[in-house]
Amino acid sequence: MLLPRINFEFIDDYIIDNKKISVIKIPSATHTPVSYKNEIYLRIGSNNKLAKEYPEKLRILWNKTSGFNYEETIVREKLTIEEVLNFLDYRTYFKMKGWDENKTSQQINDEMELDGFIVKEENYKFYKVKALGALLLAHNLKDFNLERKAVRIVIYNGITKSSIREQLEGKKGYAIGFENIIKVLKKYLPQEQRSINGRMEVFEFYPQAIIRELIANAIIHQDLSMTGSEIKIEVYDNRVEITNPGKSVIDLWRFYDCNKSRNEKLAYYMRQLKLCEELGSGIDRIVEISELNNLFTPKFIITNEYVNAKLFREKKFEKMVEEDKINILYYHCCFRYSIEDYMTNSSLRNRFLLDNSKPSTDRISNLIKKAKNMKLIKVGPNKSYIPFWAE
């Protein structure tokens, strides 16, 4: 009924004239107006009116009230210097930054205050911890009532959700717990020995570099203001799915070569700590690895409540559904354009590991025609094709 979902908090109950009165705290809208049955309402005088009938009033109201930044919210206060150092893993953080750990408690807290993780209270005796600091450095997110922001890993038997093999709940902040997430996943992701260029090497069905970027991308682009949902990594026999809460701030077909992120400070520190690529290059890097290794390009699904990235194991062209073929075609076109080259029938045949026969050429021609009709690509120079957004 309500989108995004609202967390109603019951503050207290009172008995007045033998009647129970409950005090309920309703948080204000932050990233988008709240809709009821897909409609947004405004109070005009004494009446509730559809906001779409008063677009200018909605714009003015929203501009005045939408300056909320979750990263800056205070998640714990009245902490001593020692308590701050107990709750936040400054040692791992300093090590990742290459800093000297041999500092006084005051010097350490000063560094974290400069980085915007904590702030002194007005009396200068105690500290407040910002959501940014807790989300990155918490020993245990539960200490800050942020346990629902932790990364959850679910391993399934088979290709459906019907049989859960194992379920793992994260508890650490994203920065200090990131490598452990990768380490845990590595145990469950399939790999095999293959002869590559005459040498036996370990072949990863899901390259670690792609998994890292998809997880970092989910962390950076999640909607932190949403309640009751977390980042979820699901491993099936035939695919990996990574889901983050919140509607994407980027259009589905502009993930490539786009540098907009929802949580700017979170993204900044994830890059500083070498946990993800530079701004805007994460998806580009994923596509590059997929292209160079003839792997499935991740398929992204956007809804009003979440973004889901699906990464499939190898699959021959004949066994792919059309939606997956179009997805690979589009990102192949983007990649070729980014290296100052263009997609052709021949390059796309090679991408799908098809031969040069007329049936293969015809199948690729039909696929290109469908992508053109969907307005995902357009004609480039010399019988080539470029992404719809290319100049």
Model-derived features: positions:
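Active-site helix-to-loop segments that bind/position phosphate- or nucleotide-bearing substrates
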Residues: 31, 39, 45-226, 235-238, ...
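Short acidic, hydrophobic short linear motifs in intrinsically disordered regions
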Residues: 339-352, 382-383
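A short, conserved structural fragment
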Residues: 118, 296, 369-382
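Short amphipathic alpha-helical interaction segments
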Residues: 355-370
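Long, low-complexity, charged/polar intrinsically disordered regions in eukaryotic proteins
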Residues: 141, 273-321
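Short, cationic-aromatic polyanion-contact patches
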Residues: 379-391
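Divalent-cation
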Residues: 1-41, 47-49, 139
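Glycine-rich/acidic phosphate-handling loop/turn and adjacent ATP-lid/helix
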Residues: 240-274, 315-336
